[in-house]
Amino acid sequence: MKIKGKVWKFGDNIDTDAIIPARYLNTSDPKELAKHVMEDADSSFPSKVKPGDIIIAGRNFGCGSSREHAPIAIKASGIRAVIAKSYARIFFRNAFNIGLPIFEVPELIDETNEGDEVEIDMNSGQIINLTKGKKYNTKPIPPFMQELIKAGGLVEWTKKRLSMEDIK
């Protein structure tokens, strides 16, 4: 499975409150959350992000409070993947649980600019900055995790599995 998109670049320690500010946590509607995603980090982001875009960021992306709203807001905005130097552990789990692929590639972050086009091959773990012609390698996403992503997250994957069990 390949993902290709334009890069949005953010720095270190982007916490869950910067991803989706607490003042919007009175809803869990993904479309509403998407209207405010990353607005405290870049006020133009919600209106300019396009389906298929990719976020890259520095260290400790998704730190702060444990809220599933953060990866939900990112995914609902149309972002297809996040690449960072490192992640807060709880964000890492929450992202895969809702079907948002994330990757750790520290050297890519320093060598990629906002607006560059990047292609990610989840099977091989190869990421190419198409704008600069640079290739990077990371761990491929295991087949089971790719199943979760294709299904739309753990809940949707479980629903499919349970409905398949009902058929047997």
From Swiss-Prot:
Give the first-level EC class, as a single word: lyase
What one GO molecular function would you report for this record? 3-isopropylmalate dehydratase activity
Which key words tag this protein in UniProt?
Amino-acid biosynthesis, Branched-chain amino acid biosynthesis, Leucine biosynthesis, Lyase
CDD domains according to UniProt? IPMI_Swivel (cd01577)
Cross-referenced InterPro entries, in alphabetical order? Aconitase/3IPM_dehydase_swvl (IPR015928), AconitaseA/IPMdHydase_ssu_swvl (IPR000573), IPMI_Swivel (IPR033940), LeuD (IPR050075), LeuD/DmdB_bac (IPR011824), LeuD_type2/HacB/DmdB (IPR011827)
Can you tell which superkingdom this protein's organism belongs to? Bacteria
EC no. given is 4.2.1.33
Q: Which reaction does it catalyse?
A: (2R,3S)-3-isopropylmalate = (2S)-2-isopropylmalate
Residue intervals passing through the bilayer: none
What Gene3D superfamilies does the annotation carry?
A: Aconitase, domain 4 (3.20.19.10)
**Pathway where this protein functions:** Amino-acid biosynthesis; L-leucine biosynthesis; L-leucine from 3-methyl-2-oxobutanoate: step 2/4
Under Pfam families, the record lists:
Aconitase_C (PF00694)
Q: Which biological process annotations from GO are given for this protein?
A: L-leucine biosynthetic process
**Its biological function?**
Catalyzes the isomerization between 2-isopropylmalate and 3-isopropylmalate, via the formation of 2-isopropylmaleate.
How does it associate, per the subunit comment?
Answer: Heterodimer of LeuC and LeuD.
HAMAP family listed in its UniProt record: LeuD_type2
User: Which protein family is named in the record?
Assistant: Belongs to the LeuD family. LeuD type 2 subfamily.
Protein name in UniProt: 3-isopropylmalate dehydratase small subunit
